[in-house]
Amino acid sequence: MVENQVFRIITWNAQTGTIEEKYRHLEKYHPDVVVFQEVARPKLTSDHCIWSGDNPRKGVAVITSGDYSALPAPLQPDTPDYFLPVEIEGPISLHLMAVWTHKRHNYVESVKDIVAKYRDFLKHPSTIVAGDFNSNTIWDNLHRNYCHSMMVADFDKEFNLVSSYHAKNGINHGEERDPTIFWLRNADKGYHIDYCFVPKDSSIRNVVIGNYEDWKTLSDHRPLMVDLVFSSS
């Protein structure tokens, strides 16, 4: 591993469209890995592109660039199509769980099953869980079986994972200043529902959420970009 290697990951709910069409809007940021939600199934997949979903027009995808490749991790029985476990190989190797929670799986409540099914996978020392969770502490009362705050606590206690945005900015869940979605593309209906959970002891160099004006014509979500610094072991 290269000393002080910077790893850049972007998660973005692209609100439909092809991977090729949507990815070109992110290329200028030179991401090592992109986690997409709501993108169409590509004609071909490779070790740089993995897609999963039960609707060919809307799925979750992991795209790598440069020296990085993505390998599908073994699936546990009854894994929802919109959770995609991937092994990232390259200058930095890690486990990645791509997430897009769905209404028909009770949104954040479906994460409880993923935590149970993929406990060993998520316990890898270099693990990232990223995507559109459709959840926030402000809606905990709507999910009494398993709410956002429970998920955050589980990630912290069991897997040593924290939200990069909250850790970098010293902000509590539910007190976010930067929305990641503008419901119906309305600037007055902003919510923070997209997250990138990273190891608590990792060095978070930067966390950036796209500007509303720059992205409003492309999606109701804004990309969340995270830079992590990895030192050689």
Feature roles, as predicted:
Residues 112-193:
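Metal-dependent phosphoesterases centered on the DNase I-like endonuclease/exonuclease/phosphatase
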Residues 97-111, 137-142:
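Surface-exposed cleft-lining segments at the edges of enzyme active sites
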Residues 37-106:
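Structured beta-strand-rich core segments of catalytic domains in phosphoester-bond hydrolases
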Residues 1-47, 57-60, 231-233:
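N-terminal, active-site-proximal structural segment of metallo-dependent hydrolase catalytic domains
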Residues 16-21, 39-44, 104-105, 136-138, ...:
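Active-site environment of divalent metal-dependent phosphoester hydrolases
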Residues 217-233:
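Surface polyanion/phosphate-binding segment centered on an Asp-His-Pro turn
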Residues 14, 39, 101, 133, ...:
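Active-site metal-binding loops of divalent metal-dependent hydrolases
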Residues 55-71, 88-89, 175, 182-205, ...:
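Conserved beta strand-loop-helix elements of the APE1-like EEP
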